Amino acid sequence: MLALGKLLDLTLAGREPTEKIQLTADGTRLHWLAEGALEVTPIGARDNGVDLLLSAGIHGNETAPIELLERLVRKLASGELKPAARVLFLLGNPEAIRRGERFVEQDMNRLFNGRHEEGSGNEAFRAAELERLAQVFFSRGERDRLHYDLHTAIRGSRIEQFALYPWAEGREHSRAELARLRDAGIEAVLLQNKPGITFSAYTYGQLGAEAFTLELGKARPFGQNQQVNLERLERRLEMLIDGSEERPDGAHLDGLKLFSVSREVIKHSDHFRLHLDDDVANFTELSPGYLLAEDIGGTRWVVDEVGARIIFPNPRVKNGLRAGILVVPAKL
């Protein structure tokens, strides 16, 4: 196997490879672009016009997606997987990955779409670098652009594997992409309704890619992800890479749950109180009339939506940031 196939080992060691460009026996090109960044280019005769960006490790302790990308990289470097798509692999937050921590100074997945310009430190610099790498990768015209940003969650979930589909002015959510997610094992999709500051929101809104944040289970350390079943997703990614996928038309979305954002719960002060157990699972249902949260000045969040569920509850975020999202069932 080519040395560049050990992308995770290089990243964990903080080393640059001696050879930054290597070719497999059949001519597939591997190019180390920066720390944790590897571009894979198929031979011209096999190129099917798809540009696929796969990112993981934006939060350094979310290891199952990192291990998944490592398996794909090794298969490509050994020649076991022969690409028809161009692929860019990005391990998002190398220093946090080395430490086994969610982040070092600040949550990187809230630093995109220009937010990094307002900050400083390692994560802000890296977010800007990831934007640049994605922009260059998606700069070729007349190609299909797809980005999956892979995560695992801090907490458990009533719906274990789900996706967040960004929003941008003038763009419609793709039924074909939703069907592709369902076929990859994704059980539910949250359709967002305003611009975001995540990595997938950037590639969707600014670079014209179909882009998704995928939540794939609960975060665990390296080597302890046996309970995170990514077999369907891994097989779908392999088919996307080697061009063997039969793309669904999206006429039917049976088996896929759709949700939309009803409200975001914003923490305004240190007096903020979220009236949920610390271990409450994502997609826990909340009844109308339930007092969800309180904050300074008599601010109260009372559930008035039918079928409401909570995702990403986190009362420990900094003031001014989102401490949870209320979602409701949706149709496309």
From Swiss-Prot:
* Keyword Metal-binding carried by entry: yes
Q: Which InterPro entries does the record cross-reference, listed alphabetically?
A: AspA/AstE_fam (IPR050178), AstE_AspA_cat (IPR055438), Aste_AspA_hybrid_dom (IPR007036), SuccinylGlu_desuccinylase (IPR016681)
Manner of cofactor binding, per the entry note: Binds 1 zinc ion per subunit.
The active site lies at 215
Q: Which SUPFAM superfamilies match?
A: Zn-dependent exopeptidases
What cofactor is this protein dependent on? Zn(2+)
Give residues annotated as binding Zn(2+). Answer: 59, 62, 151
Q: Which UniProt keywords apply?
A: Arginine metabolism, Hydrolase, Metal-binding, Zinc
User: Per UniProt, what is one Pfam family of this protein?
Assistant: AstE_AspA_hybrid
Top-level division of the source organism's lineage: Bacteria
Reaction(s) this enzyme catalyzes, per UniProt: N-succinyl-L-glutamate + H2O = L-glutamate + succinate
Single GO MF descriptor: hydrolase activity, acting on ester bonds
NCBIfam families registered for this protein in UniProt: arg_catab_astE (TIGR03242), PRK05324.1 (NF003706)
Q: Which protein are we looking at?
A: Succinylglutamate desuccinylase
Q: Give the gene that encodes this protein.
A: astE
